Structure formats: structure tokens, C-alpha cells
Amino acid sequence: MGAKLSSAAVLAGFSGSIYGRLVMRIAAPELTPEQTYKLMSGIVVPRPIAWITTLGPGGKVNLAPFSCYTFVSNTPPMLGVNIGRKAGLRKDTARNMLEHGHFVVNVGNADLLDAIHASAEEHPPEVSEAELLQLDVLPGEAIATPRLAAAPVSLECVLHSVTPFGDTGAEFFVGEVRLFHIRDGLARDGKIDTTLLDPVCRIGGPNYARLGPLITKRTLRQTPKSVMGQDTP
């Protein structure tokens, strides 16, 4: 796990056994930011990847992958992505999102994995990772930010809110989706065929994964989604 955990962090080594297995107890407050990140990123898995395009200096298309990402609302559709800092400074993506107020979340598939990984390398703000990796872009339609032509799914978003978290300057960016771009054949009966999408996900370290065998269970009865104040009593 890189730097060793201090004896203060590991409480009395192994604390005993549960169902015949040893359990390690680690005191979270004693961990360094790097140690915490390595633990959390290996525990919270698998994580989908938001491959985000933003507008950088001079209109250059900045491109970077982020795996602390989810959707937070369905009406209106909203996505959330956590973006940390490097040496206390905002990353290019966060800075561009705050400056322009819009961005595109592209969803890459297994064919694009090498490019997804390479786009995580750090470059000066004026460098376009899309150009560097020879990835074609298409003009945005609802916003000014371009999207990746090769991405099977792209979501044009306007920035909704930014919430700071923790002591290292991490911020949770929420964007409202204004336009969905979905490659023909991926959507069936209003749903995405995940197998055809073939998304990649992030796990701990420089490691990724693809979908394994799908396990289908019986459909459970659920109350339909509704809009607060309109469809609810």
C-alpha cells in the first residue's frame, strides 16, 4: 500500500477473528491523506469513470478521467463528481468548470481504455489532452464545451453547485444534464444495454475492470418515481 501504516494507525494489529478470519483495525485519524486515499480507492470499487471535457485557456479542450462519480438526481438529471486538489491547487478540470460553468461527461468503453488512462497524466493547462491523444471532438449543442466523438455516451452538463468536503480541498461538483448523446443501438426500450456499452471502471491503483457475467434477478415491485410537490400528496 505504499507508505507503511504507523503502529498508531493499526490498533493492536489484528483484533481477533470473525467467522474464522482475522480482522485488522485501522484508526482513520492516524492516516496520512495518501494512505487514506489508497485504502478508500481500493474499498469503494468498482467505480465508473467520468471522462470529462472542459474548455481550457485559448479554447483548448481539456480532458481528464475521474472515478469518484455518480448520478444524484433524475428530475432534472444531475451528475456528481468529486475532484481533489494537487499540492493545494485546483486541477485544470475543476478550474475550467468554475470559470465556464459547463462541461461534458463522456463515457468511455473498453476500446478507449488506453486513452482514458493516458489522459490522467498531468500537463500544463494550455495543453489539450484530446489533441495530444489524437481524439476527435464534436461541437457541443446545448453548451460550448465539445464532446468526444469516439465516446459511446456523452452528457452535456451545466454546473449546478459545488460543495467542499474534508481537509484536503476536495470539492463535489454537481452538473445538470442538458443533452444526452447516445450511440445508436445502445438504448433499447428507454434503457441502456450495458453489455453493448462495455464500460470500464476503476479499482485500486492503476487498475481497471470490465463487466463480468451479468446476474439478473426477478423484478421487484416499486413505487414509480415522482416530482416532489407535483405528483406527491
What residues fall within each predicted segment?
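Basic, polyanion-binding surface patches
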Residues: 12, 18-233
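Flexible, acidic active-site loops/lids enriched in D/E/S/T/G that coordinate Mg2+ and/or position polar
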Residues: 9
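Cationic, low-complexity basic patches in intrinsically disordered or flexible, solvent-exposed regions
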Residues: 5
